């Protein structure tokens, strides 16, 4: 990962690693692959809570990714203390996630803790809302849209070394 290799590393985080962070991970991996940058980037996702470890993402998330021709085979995992040292960037989907990340970060954390939506989304769209209890896939499609914009902008800024 980031600190063990020359690759830059990104960890996408939401509450349970079932809906938002797997979509963000899949979108980021797809963008990296399309740009031919697989040798430069390592991307994963995790959940703050250990409610769903080992499970596949929500079926609605997988359906939306499939509609956009993006494969995803990951399984949910919980955020680990070492993630804060091994990843360069850890992205929260909302302010609650960010607050939890800040509380959980061990002393000496080297990762940048950021809100994914701050990269290219309008101020009123920057929070990527949890769709877990929503009916249907419309909110998952919106998450895909938000993640696509934010990941594209982050990758562009990171490659230009514009991330502080």
Swiss-Prot record:
Record keywords, A-Z: Cytoplasm, Hydrolase, Protein phosphatase
Active-site residues, Swiss-Prot/TrEMBL: 14, 20, 130
SMART domains tied to this protein: LMWPc (SM00226)
Enzyme superclass (EC): hydrolase
Superkingdom per UniProt: Eukaryota
Expressing tissues: Cone cells and primary pigment cells in developing pupal retina.
Effect after changing residue 14 to S: Complete loss of activity
GO-annotated molecular function: acid phosphatase activity; non-membrane spanning protein tyrosine phosphatase activity; protein tyrosine phosphatase activity
InterPro entries from the UniProt entry: LMW_PTPase, Ptyr_pPase, Ptyr_pPase_sf, Tyr_Pase_low_mol_wt_mml, Tyr_phospatase_low_mol_wt
Reaction(s) catalysed (UniProt annotation): O-phospho-L-tyrosyl-[protein] + H2O = L-tyrosyl-[protein] + phosphate; a phosphate monoester + H2O = an alcohol + phosphate
Subcellular localization, as worded in the UniProt entry: Cytoplasm
UniProt-listed CDD domains: LMWPTP
Location (main, coarse): cytoplasm
Keyword RNA-binding: no
Pfam families: LMWPc (PF01451)
GO cellular component: cytoplasm
The EC number(s) this enzyme carries: 3.1.3.48, 3.1.3.2
Family designation: Belongs to the low molecular weight phosphotyrosine protein phosphatase family.
Role of this protein: Catalyzes the dephosphorylation of tyrosine phosphorylated proteins and low-MW aryl phosphates. Can contribute to the regulation of a variety of developmental processes.
Protein name per its UniProtKB record: Low molecular weight phosphotyrosine protein phosphatase 2
Organism, scientific name: Drosophila melanogaster
Gene: primo-2
């Amino acid at each position: 990962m980031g600190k063990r290799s020359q690759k830059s590393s990104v960890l996408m985080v939401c509450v349970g690693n079932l809906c938002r962070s797997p979509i963000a991970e899949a979108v980021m991996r797809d963008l990296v692959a399309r740009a031919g940058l697989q040798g430069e980037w390592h991307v994963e996702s995790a959940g703050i809570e250990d409610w769903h470890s080992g499970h596949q993402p929500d079926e609605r998330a997988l359906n939306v990714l499939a509609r956009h021709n993006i494969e995803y085979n990951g399984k949910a995992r919980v955020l680990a203390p070492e993630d804060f040292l091994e990843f360069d960037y850890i992205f929260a989907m909302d302010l609650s996630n960010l607050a939890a990340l800040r509380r959980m970060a061990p002393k000496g954390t080297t990762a940048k803790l950021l809100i994914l939506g701050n990269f290219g989304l309008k101020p009123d769209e920057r929070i990527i809302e949890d769709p877990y209890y929503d009916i249907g896939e419309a909110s998952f499609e919106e998450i895909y849209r938000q993640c696509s914009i934010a990941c594209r902008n982050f990758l562009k800024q990171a490659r230009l070394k514009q991330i502080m």
